[in-house]
Amino acid sequence: MTFSTQIKAELVQNKLIDKHWNVFLAGFFQNNLKLLYNRNWSFKVQSEALKEQFVQNLKFDFKTKASKKYFLFEFNADINVINTLLKLDVTTSELVVKQVYLIAAFLSGGSVSDLINSNNFHLQISSNNEFQIQQLLKLFSFFKKTVKQNQLVVYLKSYEKICNFLKLIQAFDGYLAFENKQLEKSFTLNQLRKSNLEVANLMKTIRSNNQTNQLQLKSFIKSSSFAKRPLNFQRYCLIKSDHPDWSLEQIANFFFTKYNIKISRSGIQHFSVNLKKLCQ
């Protein structure tokens, strides 16, 4: 189930729809209704729950057809009755009426980005009705308008504004899921920043220690005690001085290539331990 489907499943169950059915019809029909012929009209719904909502409340004589993607309603109604719905303006109505209209508009043409795979939050309502788009812009002033695929669209990209819209249309479960996703995202980003800072500090420490060790090594090579050490140990010190980042294996390979001497990595490690003791 997508997050859009989850939100719509919650909205369909809102009891306000039954109480303000004509407002709901207006919000839905202003985007979704098509005139077939004479006084015959059609519209589509995509969920079983929304289909049942119309079956229970639609006062017109209707018939339904089911396909794999949607349910098609066809009904007969007087054009004056339909025009009243299509021209309904709720921008100056009480809050509950505005909420029902927005619920219908979202159920008709709304979508929101999925929580799992999306890093950028996006909510939109598409409509082919300029009158409805203008109402949506007034009902929720944070909406911005654009055109996508020959459809008018109002949209939100801000996390806070999407949360506010979900609360306005009483999609409270969706709002909480959205909040939790943002908290997870913020926590992950904070952990990543913290981890990056720790790595950066560690690298600074390592570089500082390496610089100190190199100075101590060069000082030891110049000391009188250096010449008293075994030849291979002296060679190790010189190699380490010239190539401080080499691994044990690289140094062992160099011994074999340069001096034809086989020294195991454990032997090189032994040189390293002795050098650290001498440089302390």
UniProtKB/Swiss-Prot annotation:
Keywords: Cell cycle, Cell division, DNA-binding. One of its GO terms (biological process) is regulation of sporulation. The keyword ATP-binding does not apply. Involved in cell division and chromosome segregation. InterPro entries: Homing_endonucl, Sporulation_regulator_WhiA, Sporulation_regulator_WhiA_C, WhiA_LAGLIDADG_dom. The keyword Cell cycle applies. Belongs to the WhiA family. This is Probable cell division protein WhiA. SUPFAM superfamilies: Homing endonucleases.
